[in-house]
A protein has these predicted regions:
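Cap/lid segment of the alpha/beta-hydrolase catalytic domain
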Residues: 1-2, 92-95
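Gly/Ala-rich beta-loop-alpha elbow adjacent to hydrolase catalytic centers
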Residues: 16-26
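Active-site signature of alpha/beta-hydrolase-fold catalytic machinery across serine-
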Residues: 27-31
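The feature captures the conserved acid-bearing segment of alpha/beta-hydrolase catalytic domains
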Residues: 37-90
Length: 121
């Protein structure tokens, strides 16, 4: 809230999180719907009372644990050949499948999807 209050000149806010950061972002948005225009989840899914209409969910096709948790149909982008760790730059993550596309490709596709989602509003 402090950041949003400090930058009151910014009229549209989107919160984004990867993995458990997505859970935290989703939790914040569910309690502060009046302050945020949208939620962007990378390798994560909606937690709490957040509209799928105002949420963009992006996950790699090889990140099957996320797919199992998604019970909504709107604003979902599946990056073919992508995995969980390639949304970040932290290397291999135990239990993650090996991506069949490069980290750069996955991140570029992610940027494009986020840009399109934000511009639609």
């Amino acid at each position: 809230n402090k950041i949003i209050d400090k930058y009151s000149n910014i009229k549209h806010w989107y919160l984004c999180g990867h993995s458990m950061g997505g859970a935290m972002a989703s939790s914040y948005v569910s309690k502060n719907k009046d302050k945020v225009d949208g939620l962007i989840l990378l390798g994560s899914y909606i937690y709490g009372d957040v509209s799928a209409q105002d949420t963009l969910t992006i996950y790699g096709s090889l990140n099957t644990s996320v797919k199992k948790k998604i019970d909504y149909k709107k604003n979902i982008v599946v990056i073919q050949g992508g995995n969980h760790a390639n949304f970040g730059n932290y290397g291999y993550q135990k239990g993650d499948a090996k991506a069949t596309i490069s980290r750069k490709s996955q991140q570029n596709q992610t940027i494009k999807a986020i840009d399109q989602f934000i511009k639609k509003d």
